[in-house]
């Protein structure tokens, strides 16, 4: 079966829930790939061929449904560092320093979130910056931004 569109998302459209659901668990990097071969937890094989410019896959996306059975995307937890600098100056310093490494980052309120990296931990500990290591399902995948020097 070739999937060319997302039917909806069970978190936003509960009516898409069915009695039987197969799950395809994807890691962060796979969420942005619009063409890939997938296998569900029940062994069903699918081809994904989404149009160019399609947004990343999300937890709860419905790839197939016949009313009784469905195939859903589940996002695997990502190992991340939740960075909580104490001052605005510290946040600017951390953001600038990690930005120079071209690390993809996300922000949630006053928390900077990056994928776990032992060199980042060494940096944070060296400068006394508060952080917490956590495994969590990210709402959007980490992405590298385009840049030139």
From Swiss-Prot:
Q: Which GO terms describe its cellular component?
A: cytoplasm
Known function? Involved in urease metallocenter assembly. Binds nickel. Probably functions as a nickel donor during metallocenter assembly.
The name this protein carries in UniProt is Urease accessory protein UreE
Q: Matching InterPro entries, A to Z?
A: UreE, UreE_C_dom, UreE_N, UreE_N_sf
Broad class of where this protein is predominantly found: cytoplasm
List GO molecular-function terms, semicolon-separated: nickel cation binding; unfolded protein binding
Supply the alphabetized keyword list: Chaperone, Cytoplasm, Nickel, Nickel insertion
Family (UniProt): Belongs to the UreE family.
For this protein, the record's Gene3D superfamilies field holds: Urease metallochaperone UreE, N-terminal domain, UreE, C-terminal domain
Per the UniProt record, the source organism is Corynebacterium efficiens (strain DSM 44549 / YS-314 / AJ 12310 / JCM 11189 / NBRC 100395)
Q: Where in the cell is it found?
A: Cytoplasm
Encoding gene, per UniProt annotation:
ureE
